[in-house]
């Protein structure tokens, strides 16, 4: 079982972005001290839902601040950035961190970001497969040319090569950074499976929905010629929420008190690029749903819920939102308890 944190750098009502980012950095430092496996960083623009606009930039800082823990993006949005630029950044972080970086990618949403960064609605609706293909080419080949509808350019040399990681004895370790794909639809599940890429599944999904997506991924990957061994060992990641307290109701109350205000403020701030109608989740009902799905409660309850999800879905990697209280000290305590009290119950 590999348990990590999911860091949104959430800006709660009454807070500034600096407070949210400081909490993100501190929670990562505590995660490493507490023995957790990884930290996953979200990326958002123009909204207080999450105030980190560049997951790879924050990943670079956190990789420099830590020595053991893995740091991943959850996710870097391909619809609003050039896949070659992202590939260069990923290779750089992979090589300079000793292989501790994971690149999570997704297509994002139909937000005004598409207008600001120039991709347009076309990039969101049709461009993800081409962007992913170009990114994977960059991470795996010595020379790359752009031959798609969106990206066309002459062949260039890949520098630095992501597959030239130095080992402790001075040799080279083959392979570039791990790449995972955020999947919210069968179409994206099939795309990830055909590429043999693990999935990152959202915290709004229950175990049955995640199990169904894993089953679709497995059948598609096998049909695409992936080996049974690679399919069995695919490291899918389940996103969730964790709040550890001595009593179940105490943990739930902490989140129900703080999260709805953040959700309401953050979700209402999203603006669609084309004015399409959108229905916002009820913040209180959504918080209560998350409390029922995920490890929210005493250490034993939290461990049992993680173990149950692993048994039902086959997923043994977790990215858990730990800042739901909105408070720095409470977040640090929550992360510490997750690592020192819950994790030992899973080994």
Briefly describe each language-model feature range.
Residues 1, 82-198, 208-215, 222-232:
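Internal, glycine-rich beta/alpha segment that forms the wall or movable "lid"
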Residues 7-22, 76-84, 174-183, 290-299:
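Active-site mouth loops of central-metabolism enzymes
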Residues 1-73:
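N-terminal beta1-alpha1-beta2 module of alpha/beta enzyme domains
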Residues 3-7, 39-41, 71-73, 101-105, ...:
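Hydrophobic faces of well-ordered beta-strands that scaffold small-molecule active sites
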Residues 18-30, 183-190, 301-308:
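Short, acidic/polar
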Residues 31, 35, 43, 62, ...:
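Conserved, mostly hydrophobic/aromatic
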Residues 122-163, 208-316:
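An alpha-helical appendage that flanks or caps ligand/catalytic pockets
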Residues 36, 98, 197, 313-315:
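A structural motif
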